[in-house]
Amino acid sequence: MTNLDIFLIDYEIYKANPNWWLDITEIFLKPGLIFKASFNNEHTNILEKISAYGSDLSISFEKNVLGVEGIINEEMIRDFKASYKVKNGDGIDYYSPFISLEIGENYCSAHHGSELYLSNLSEDELEKIYKIINPLDQYLKFDIS
């Protein structure tokens, strides 16, 4: 099994492929997996959306950051992909609405999508990820172990 860390080093990646983060994240979005997400507490609309998917959520609050933990379902995946868009603030692109996002045991996104930590990747997952990141290598730094 392989571990792959991906770091965004050039925000011009948006011009080459604005959906690179979602394309990688989709590989790991599977119903039944546990997710953990954190986001700024002023983004209560995110909490409202996530809460609509079920009552089996755990919600925490710490230093202006809301945390949510729950189980991914088909409706959540469909809506997440349909509503996805990159937001720009202060000259920085935010690829994820979440400060951090963990999916299952293999996926962690940090700093609004500018860092990805992928662990225990199968050959199939690694091949899919390489198809996404190889054309973008000038915008990303990656470490493999």
Task: Please report, for each region that a protein language model flagged, where it lies by residue.
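Structured alpha/beta or helical-core interaction and ligand-binding surfaces enriched in interleaved
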Residues: M1-S145
